[in-house]
Swiss-Prot record:
<dbReference type="GO" id="GO:0005829">
    <property type="term" value="C:cytosol"/>
</dbReference>
<keyword id="KW-0539">Nucleus</keyword>
<keyword id="KW-0378">Hydrolase</keyword>
<dbReference type="GO" id="GO:0005634">
    <property type="term" value="C:nucleus"/>
</dbReference>
<dbReference type="InterPro" id="IPR029058">
    <property type="entry name" value="AB_hydrolase_fold"/>
</dbReference>
<keyword id="KW-0963">Cytoplasm</keyword>
<comment type="similarity">
    <text>Belongs to the AB hydrolase superfamily.</text>
</comment>
<dbReference type="GO" id="GO:0016787">
    <property type="term" value="F:hydrolase activity"/>
</dbReference>
<dbReference type="Pfam" id="PF07859">
    <property type="entry name" value="Abhydrolase_3"/>
</dbReference>
<protein>
    <recommendedName>
        <fullName>AB hydrolase superfamily protein C1039.03</fullName>
        <ecNumber>3.-.-.-</ecNumber>
    </recommendedName>
</protein>
<dbReference type="InterPro" id="IPR013094">
    <property type="entry name" value="AB_hydrolase_3"/>
</dbReference>
<dbReference type="InterPro" id="IPR050300">
    <property type="entry name" value="GDXG_lipolytic_enzyme"/>
</dbReference>
Amino acid sequence: MSQTTTETIIPLDSSVKDKLDPEYVNFYNKYVCSNLPIVKTHTYPVDFLRNNGNVMPGQSELLPVESTEDITIPRKHTKAPSGVPSRIFRPHGTAPEGGWPCFLWFHGGGWVLGNINTENSFATHMCEQAKCVVVNVDYRLAPEDPFPACIDDGWEALLYCYENADTLGINPNKIAVGGSSAGGNIAAVLSHKVAASPANFPPLVLQLLVVPVCDNTANAKTHKSWELFENTPQLPAAKMMWYRRHYLPNEKDWSNPEASPFFYPDSSFKNVCPALICAAGCDVLSSEAIAYNEKLTKAGVESTIKIYEGCPHPVMAMDAVLEKGRILNKDATNALLAAFA
């Protein structure tokens, strides 16, 4: 039976403590371990987790942008009873000739948690630092809407950007996709889908995959990080499996390329856009990120992987307290600027 009471935060597991960045360890011990209740995601009901928010501190403040607009993207290409809520951030300044570059972003949360507000800090930083319109997609979540609902929502959002570039004030030749964790999974899938689309859309200029889920069949036998970081903080293996089973209740879907982009055929990899993959060194997902980068590179795709050693899964969302979180932010900015040039 799922627990509904909070527990005392436990110390960092001995199997991983010495591998973690000292800056993270100090922050965890000072501000997390002693002051906050633990929320063991895989032992709590989904509604409890959604209503109690993200207890992990460390995210930087939002950057001021020129404007923020919430819209609902009408559903045109897939089947569902409603459109796709999204938030549009526009940067300060004068748009370049042809329109602003566009960055389509998908938040993390294991396809179960998170929402349009979860990663606004990162979205506003990319908007201002990379001078692009950011479309933050509030895709449907499992278990209410399991696979492939979020993929359909992401596809609607991407095609909306292509088909309504003039209205949005963006350049359809300068569109990038990205996401963190489960959102990185969605972005990777969309990179394959648009490359294979018969609609002849301009190619994406970048896929920015931050601590992405690339292989939903992964386990300790197939991916070393699942063994090494079974008890890593914030995304232990049991927690990842909790997410997977909510999103993919039918195990036969685990190897579907739209759930595990690692399993797209080699012919599909040859056509996808360049990539920057940001992996956390102490993340259960790090091995599959490395394997995905190798597959992209083998296919001739310009792909770079950066590994933030000693960092746990949420390094991107800890840029206010971790130097390596700030470095990741800068790496992402530079990759977008180069792709949009």
